[in-house]
Amino acid sequence: GEGLRPRFILAYFLAAVLAIPAWLALSRRLGKHRTWCVAMMLAIVAFATVPLIPHGAFGAFFAVCVLTGAALGADLALPPSIQADVVDYDAWKQGEARAGFLFALWSMATKFAQALAVGIGLPLVAALGFDPAQVTAPGQFALTVIYAWFPIVFKVIAVALVWNFTLDERRLL
């Protein structure tokens, strides 16, 4: 399994890059916000299966890497485009350019979310019995559950917030 790690990582990022054109095409039909939500739902379904994958089922984990990587393609392409729409709308609504402020705010929120994930995830996995110095089956399962299901919680919240986001292409025009 350890020797396959580079292939899993390559599959993940290659799927992200290759999926971007498909996400962009879908966003022209569904809108950016809902397309991003569809991608997050794909990641949710893929991540939900991880604790159910038997030890050594590398093909199944490879499929998870490809699916979550494809979802990453939307994460890379759509939020910056949505941000640009927000900047344009804000400039029109406020009558002044505040792009620097808005991008700084977005960057700060992203860093806060990452810090929150680490600040909650690592103590939680330790509390559930994972010890990297002495890996046990229950500890390994706890790590797997946190790795897979912890992002699901935040993605479900994100989908709920983004699905009906009122600023879309029609409102900008």
Spell out what each predicted region is.
Residues G1-L173:
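Membrane-embedded alpha-helical bundles of multi-pass transporters/translocases
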